[in-house]
């Protein structure tokens, strides 16, 4: 016990002076160029991206069913995960967006979701239960399910770590736990739930889709347009969105010249936000799968089979009048599985009686869809968002302009409140929202648009302007969300920042954010998400900012804010070790960094053992012992050797029994 106490005291005593010193000497560049930092920044950019709702005609949905998909939203969804810009798209991107890109493989993302996606996880569960009771569940691809469901996340996160442990050997690298941290964070952030206090999951645009099978295309388009305007969205979601139109030509059953003529008529009426694409309606499957019911082994064989091993004569149409289809094997690709599936969706899919089958697609269709999504994003979505930001800035200048205009507005607001006892501001304390047409809601949307456009500096300034308004109105959910994204904005900026001047503000915003999310709103998801994201981003900054990041993450490990289960406690302790194990961290001496990583690995080993993950406990012990066995501290080395037998499964079972 004395050795352990001495060990902890000595390790923590090294952190304290370094943390205090960091607020005085932080001048290097704040840009993190190591592999973990690049992946984390890309992950954050992919999380907070524009959402596009799908409104497809009946003929489109029938076309997709013949092609092997549940609906058009399921078909287009994975093509929005990774969108790479071409040289012709640069003119549509602002200088701030280009400056925020820090590596060659940087990409953008958009989320394609069905119209019914505007619902919270609780509502989605109720609808799913009702469908199950009424026999409406089927074996088709899982529909979109929102994120934020903690129960399903906890189940899948444990499976994620177990798979990582089983996939490796005992010789894990020092920074080997960084990849599981990213996978865990991606699972947490997938399916960003619809919320009133942030507009990232609110629709930026809507894609209206019809096919060449439609007998009255213009009338159908106008009907779908009216349905969008009359959709029962919550009043905190604005319907001022971009409308984009897609015409699908059936390559197998319709005349191309006739389809092009119809599309040109549509384009003259609807404008430039229209696109024409050619797709085949035949569902391409392999003979072993051409049965009435697809079994799991056949599905897995298709998913895992190398493309070169498939012969062209094994493919046929799945329609009733099945005919051989001539395809060259090298011109076929597996349909990409969506990367950003929420834990609720993954769990629902695993509970189905049969797994979804992702068909094969001709390479021309895959490339055509990629080109369409790229054109839509860079030529329409981004320019639309930029125009919105400029228009909102002009409209809101009287309230959020220079110092003089803001003082005049503040005095007017003060006197109007004094002379009107019924004035309650724009915030509704009963429904806890600002309606979409209110200035505060527009300002928040303007900041979120700037963030999604990667103009982090401007977004930070806007969040800073509206934070005081949320505080005065006691709009706690808006205030906490504003502080969360404001911290992320500051840490995502591709420029030098001085932690000497910023750390006091960061700590204040962080503490208030955690208090509101955990105590006032009792939201485990938002508390956990905000702490994990901001801590990991802060750990990338130079010098000893990593010590502040560790202290942030350690705050939710203390009893009080939120109730963590044993697995989450073990994971977060190991995450702190993983942050210190980042070899390419700037400004921290290698020996100091490795000792702190070893301390947290050793500290978390016991937690892993107690929650039944003895293999993880052994991995953490090995990573810590690599450092301590060479430390020259004989008593500590002996303590580590004495600790190893206590991490075994037999010791845990015996200790539990007693």
UniProtKB/Swiss-Prot annotation:
Keywords: ER-Golgi transport, Golgi apparatus, Meiosis, Transport. The keyword Transport applies. GO terms for cellular component: cell division site; cytosol; nucleus; TRAPPIII protein complex. It is found in: Golgi apparatus, cis-Golgi network. This is Transport protein particle subunit trs85-1. It comes from Schizosaccharomyces pombe (strain 972 / ATCC 24843). Coiled coil: none annotated. PANTHER family: TRANSPORT PROTEIN PARTICLE SUBUNIT TRS85-1, TRANSPORT PROTEIN TRAPP. The lineage of its organism: Eukaryota, Fungi, Dikarya, Ascomycota, Taphrinomycotina.
């Amino acid at each position: 016990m004395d050795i352990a106490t001495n060990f902890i005291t000595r390790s923590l005593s090294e952190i304290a002076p370094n943390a205090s010193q960091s607020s005085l000497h932080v001048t290097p560049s704040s840009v993190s160029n190591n592999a973990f930092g690049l992946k984390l920044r890309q992950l954050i950019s992919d999380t907070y991206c524009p959402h596009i709702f799908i409104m497809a005609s009946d003929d489109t949905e029938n076309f997709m069913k013949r092609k092997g998909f549940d609906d058009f939203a399921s078909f287009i969804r994975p093509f929005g995960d990774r969108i790479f810009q071409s040289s012709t798209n640069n003119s549509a991107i602002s200088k701030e967006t280009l400056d925020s890109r820090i590596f060659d493989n940087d990409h953008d993302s958009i989320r394609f979701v069905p119209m019914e996606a505007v619902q919270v996880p609780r509502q989605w569960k109720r609808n799913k239960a009702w469908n199950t009771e009424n026999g409406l569940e089927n074996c088709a691809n899982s529909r979109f399910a929102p994120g934020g469901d903690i129960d399903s996340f906890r189940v899948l996160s444990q499976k994620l770590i177990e798979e990582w442990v089983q996939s490796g050997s005992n010789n894990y690298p020092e920074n080997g736990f960084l990849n599981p941290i990213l996978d865990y964070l991606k699972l947490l952030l997938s399916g960003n739930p619809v919320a009133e206090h942030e507009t990232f999951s609110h629709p930026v645009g809507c894609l209206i889709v019809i096919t060449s099978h439609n007998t009255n295309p213009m009338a159908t388009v106008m009907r779908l347009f009216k349905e969008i305007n009359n959709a029962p969205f919550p009043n905190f979601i604005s319907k001022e969105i971009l409308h984009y139109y897609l015409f699908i030509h059936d390559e197998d059953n319709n005349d191309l010249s006739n389809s092009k003529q119809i599309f040109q008529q549509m384009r003259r009426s609807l404008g430039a936000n229209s696109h024409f694409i050619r797709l085949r309606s035949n569902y391409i499957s392999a003979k072993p799968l051409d049965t009435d019911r697809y079994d799991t082994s056949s599905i897995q064989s298709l998913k895992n089979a190398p493309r070169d091993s498939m012969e062209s004569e094994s493919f046929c149409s799945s329609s009733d009048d099945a005919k051989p289809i001539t395809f060259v094997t090298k011109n076929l690709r597996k349909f990409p599985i969506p990367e950003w599936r929420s834990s609720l969706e993954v769990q629902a899919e695993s509970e189905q009686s049969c797994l979804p089958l992702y068909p094969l697609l001709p390479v021309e269709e895959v490339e055509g869809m990629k080109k369409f999504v790229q054109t839509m994003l860079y030529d329409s979505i981004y320019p639309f968002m930029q125009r919105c930001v400029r228009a909102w800035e002009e409209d809101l200048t009287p309230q959020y302009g220079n110092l003089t205009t803001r003082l005049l507005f503040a005095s007017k607001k003060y006197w109007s409140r004094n002379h009107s006892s019924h004035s309650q501001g724009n915030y509704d304390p009963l429904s806890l929202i600002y309606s979409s047409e209110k200035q505060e809601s527009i300002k928040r949307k303007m900041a979120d648009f700037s963030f999604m456009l990667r103009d982090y500096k401007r977004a930070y300034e806007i969040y800073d302007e509206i934070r005081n308004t949320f505080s005065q109105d006691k709009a706690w959910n808006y205030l906490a969300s504003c502080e969360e994204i404001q911290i992320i904005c500051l840490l995502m900026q591709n420029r030098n920042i001085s932690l000497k001047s910023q750390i006091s503000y960061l700590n204040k915003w962080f503490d208030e954010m955690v208090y509101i999310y955990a105590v006032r709103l009792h939201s485990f998801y938002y508390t956990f998400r905000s702490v994990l994201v901001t801590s990991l981003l802060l750990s990338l900054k130079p010098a000893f900012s990593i010590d502040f990041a560790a202290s942030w993450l350690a705050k939710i490990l203390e009893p009080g804010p939120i109730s963590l289960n044993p697995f989450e406690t073990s994971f977060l302790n190991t995450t702190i070790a993983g942050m210190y194990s980042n070899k390419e961290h700037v400004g921290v001496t290698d020996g100091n960094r490795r000792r702190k990583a070893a301390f947290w690995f050793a500290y978390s080993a016991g937690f892993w053992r107690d929650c039944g993950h003895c293999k993880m406990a052994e991995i953490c012990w090995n990573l810590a012992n690599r450092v301590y066995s060479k430390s020259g501290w004989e008593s500590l080395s002996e303590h580590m050797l004495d600790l190893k037998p206590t991490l075994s499964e037999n010791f845990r079972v015996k200790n539990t029994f007693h």
